[in-house]
Design a protein with these regions (language model features):
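ATPase catalytic-site recognition across NTP-hydrolyzing enzymes
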Residues: 188-227
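Walker B catalytic acidic pair
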Residues: 122-124
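Inter-Walker segment of RecA-like/P-loop motor cores
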Residues: 63-117, 216
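Residue-level preference for the first positions of well-ordered beta-strands
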Residues: 22-24, 54-56, 100, 118, ...
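Conserved P-loop
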Residues: 20-89
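A short beta-strand-to-loop transition that corresponds to the Sensor-1 phosphate-sensing loop
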Residues: 29, 61, 104-106, 156-161, ...
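ASCE P-loop NTPase helicase motor core
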Residues: 126-203
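Pre-P-loop entry segment of helicase/translocase ATPase cores
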Residues: 1-22
Length: 227
């Protein structure tokens, strides 16, 4: 079994991700979104009945993928015998033949030709606007429904103005086939109130609202309501 006990919001996300093929999740900093999505990918990879299951975590840079996600993958597979890690390629090979790759969005041409049974796109607003519609979405097409299992894409991140992540957030709010969720620090209880007060007192208001209150309006040039 995976040594992971989800928090309440993480359990909500797992339930939603199990139902919806597409999901956009906006979370405050340190909410646990990366831990949740990696464990979701890991669970699905271990349980998949497809031949050669392939799951992916895509970050804006190689360094971010390694720094943010690699150690978590090792931590949560520590009790699973037969796992093999390729440090150079940031690849986890599971004993059932499934594979989880950590990928970088720095050169999208290197991603062309892959197939994916499930992918997390972390901070897509820091990547090319074409990387999902032209590269990732086609990779989800041919194996959807194989052995009764859907392929899926999960977008996670923190707001950074009106970029492509903001566009996907608005799409998810309007499209019933998409799941959309926002978790603000003032609502989740993940970070103690005392720590939030300390952060608010030491950060510019826009920065605090963006990082902890999930504001897409903070630090947007020309925004009418920037606070």
């Amino acid at each position: 079994s995976i040594p992971y006990t989800p928090r309440a919001i993480q359990a909500e996300l797992h339930a939603a991700w199990s139902v919806h093929r597409y999901s956009v999740v906006i979370c405050h900093r340190r909410a646990g979104k990366t831990v949740a999505v990696l464990n979701h990918l890991l669970r699905d990879a271990l349980m998949s009945k497809k031949p050669n299951p392939r799951f992916h975590y895509l970050a804006p840079t190689y360094r971010m993928a390694k720094t943010v996600a690699w150690d978590y993958l090792k931590q949560f597979t520590d009790t699973i015998p037969g796992c093999k890690f390729n440090e150079t390629e940031l690849r986890l090979d599971l004993p059932n033949g499934a594979r989880i790759n950590l990928l970088s969005g720095e050169d999208e041409t290197k991603l062309r030709g892959i197939y994916s049974d499930g992918i997390c796109i972390d901070e897509c607003g820091l990547m090319s606007e074409t990387i999902y519609p032209e590269v990732i979405r086609p990779a989800l097409s041919d194996r959807n429904g194989l052995n009764g299992e859907k392929t899926y894409a999960i977008f996670i991140g923190t707001p950074l103005g009106h970029n492509v992540f903001y566009d996907y957030y608005n799409k998810a709010k309007e499209d019933p086939e998409w799941h959309c969720a926002m978790y603000r620090a003032s609502e989740t209880g993940v970070i103690p109130e005392e720590e939030l007060r300390a952060a608010r007192s030491s950060m510019p208001e826009d920065a605090y609202n963006q990082e902890f209150e999930c504001s897409f309006e903070a630090n947007v040039p020309g925004a009418v309501y920037s606070k």
